[in-house]
Amino acid sequence: MALHTVLVINSGSSSIKYQLVDPASGQALASGLVERIGEEMGAITHKHDEAKTVIEAPVPDHRAGLAKVLELFESEGPSLAEANIAAVGHRVVQGGRYFDGPALVNEAVENRVEALIPLGPLHNGPALAGIRVARQLLPDVPHVVVFDTAFFQGLPEASARYALNREVADKYEIRRYGAHGTSHQYVSSTVSQLLGRDDLKQIVLHLGNGASASAVVNGRAVDTSMGLTPLEGLVMGTRTGDIDPAAVFHLARVAGMDAQELDHLFNRESGMKGLCGDNDMREVWKRIDAGDTQAREAMDIYIHRLLKYVGSYTAVMGGLDALTFTAGIGENDAAIRAELCARLGWLGVELDEQANNQRSPEPRVVSTPDSKVKVLVVPTNEELAIARQAMTLV
């Protein structure tokens, strides 16, 4: 058993993801997922060593869900009493302008996370619920919050400030906050270590069901695609990404949609799902291979948006040394990497086809030795990053 471990918790509106991490070795000692919180019957999956336990039970709220998780640690292992937990790390999406790093949880921090719910309505409320029940159930362990927005706190004003009326923007705290910052920081740092250089101009593409891009110069973020909320930027699984804000006014006027309906449309029924009915890229590729023109068009739109961001960020940074793919799609979809890189020859990008098609859990370079821009695939590990940040405060 590790000398010190961190229990990392990511609370969603109807789920709790968790992982027991040894920050020193990077090893995940156990992990699991509580699903369908608040429904008639919930499900809990717990993995430890090679064993996987799945149970179904009523999970009326987050407290009941986390209590079930703690029971599973004791019955299935590893015992938390023997794991020497140094901290509980909580992922919180929106830290506003108040948090540029991890923070020890106290009443004031809880209150600030709650006050930021209007800026992160889909994420901060569930995260706060998880924090509160975890502090009740594990009262003798320090709790640390790690914010998705923290890595982007230092964005230049030219990137962070919208061209919205200054008084209105400041009053309602409307600016670019970004998201996935923990992943972007972890991945860009890993690239620097892998290439043995800190003086890099990097673009990181975090491509999962949620997707974001970042421009990183010498380890500091200078731009990112997600904005006030995670809705802005790239085409995503179910989110629009960039869209003319007037579409909101138009739909309100002609379709009679209210704010809740528009929020649902833009966040849950758009993106790849809205374009072709599928937000699973594996299914999209199957349909493309079968000659489905709607799926092909959706993929073209997806790649086009990526291309725009790579080009604009290269201009913002005045060059590009490394282009990195991460997260579920970025790490596993060789075809998307190939299609994007095929259109970046003007940057001197040369993809090594064999390296690109090879699956590996390790960080790796997938460009040719002659490529002027290093292209990499780096598996993200947000849980490890959260655990290591938590350990800096305990």
Located regions from the model:
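Glycine-rich phosphate-binding loop of actin/hexokinase-like ATP-binding domains
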Residues: 151-254
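Glycine-rich beta-strand-to-loop/alpha-helix junction loops that act as flexible
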Residues: 12, 90-95, 207-209, 320-332
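Short beta-strand-loop/turn "lid" adjacent to the catalytic site in phosphate-handling enzymes
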Residues: 73-123, 144, 150-159
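Catalytic phosphate/nucleotide-handling subdomain of diverse soluble enzymes
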Residues: 217, 223-255, 264, 327-358
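A mobile "lid/hinge" subdomain adjacent to the ATP/sugar-phosphate binding pocket shared
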Residues: 255-298
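Short glycine-rich, Thr/Ser-proximal phosphate-binding strand/loop in the N-terminal lobe
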Residues: 6, 15-59, 227
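Internal helix-turn-beta structural module
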Residues: 296, 300-316, 330-394
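Phosphate/pyrophosphate-binding loops at sites that engage ATP/ADP/AMP, CoA/4′-phosphopantetheine
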Residues: 71-86, 191-196, 310-321
